[in-house]
Each structure stands twice: as structure tokens, then as C-alpha cells.
């Protein structure tokens, strides 16, 4: 692990001696982040009557189309679950789009949020913000982390008590090979 600041790299040996508790602090950070995310997810799952139900069939259709719109152009979908008041979405950004331009996470999220907000607001005959400004994104670092992220995403409707098997939830998608999770 190294740190980059203003295009200057701090040598690993110096980083370790200057901050001997770095690994401990890193583990505390990840532990607190995990607890925060769990508490946030629990709050979302407990809200049974959201002002806009994303899992209504028409809203789910809008979201499914949007989540697949950039497939093969800017991203590869691995899994998603459309819950009544939030979405879990695991995807891999491509380095470049079909025109050879770099692909940025914020551009994909903004595009999906803008389009789905417009369409769902129209369907629900409402105005205003549909999505929170903040999204909780996580960088997946290896295959094990990817496996657990997909499993967590697919099983979210089960954990929320909405179905007994994730395959029974209409707003859930799992990539090929996800059937046994």
C-alpha cells in the first residue's frame, strides 16, 4: 500500500515507520464503515411504506431498463436488487466507452438517476428529487469481495423479509453463475 499526494509518492518503509498504527486504524475504519452501512440498510429495510415505491411493477421496469442501458457500452452488470426505497447495484465500469472515451462512475450514476427520476416522477405524478444526493459506493478489490457483494445484493430482499428466495423478488438480477448464491 502506498499513498499518493500531489503526484509525490511516500515510500512504503517511511509510511510504516511514520504511522505504526496505520493497519489498525485502517481496520477500525472498515469496521466502522461496515457498521454504519449495516445500520443504514436496516433503516431502509424497516421503512415499509416509502413515499415512492421503487418495487412497483412500472417503477421496477423503468429501473431495470436504466440499469441495463449502459450494459456493454460503459459497464458490465453483475447484480442488482430494486428494493421498495433503494437499490443495490453491483457493476464493473469499463475503462473506455464505445467512442474510446474514459468512463466515470459519477457520470453513469448521474445519468441513471436523472433518467429514472424523470420517468418515475412522471409515472407517479410527482415532482422534486427522487434520489438522495449521496450514494454509497464501494470499490471492489478482488474476486472474494465481488462474490460477497453479489451475494449480499441478491439476498437483500430476503434479509428485508420480502421473500424467502432472492429469485422470487421481481426486481432482482444476477449474472450468469449467480443462481447458487
Language model features with spans:
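Short catalytic/metal-binding and nucleic-acid-binding patches
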Residues: 1-181
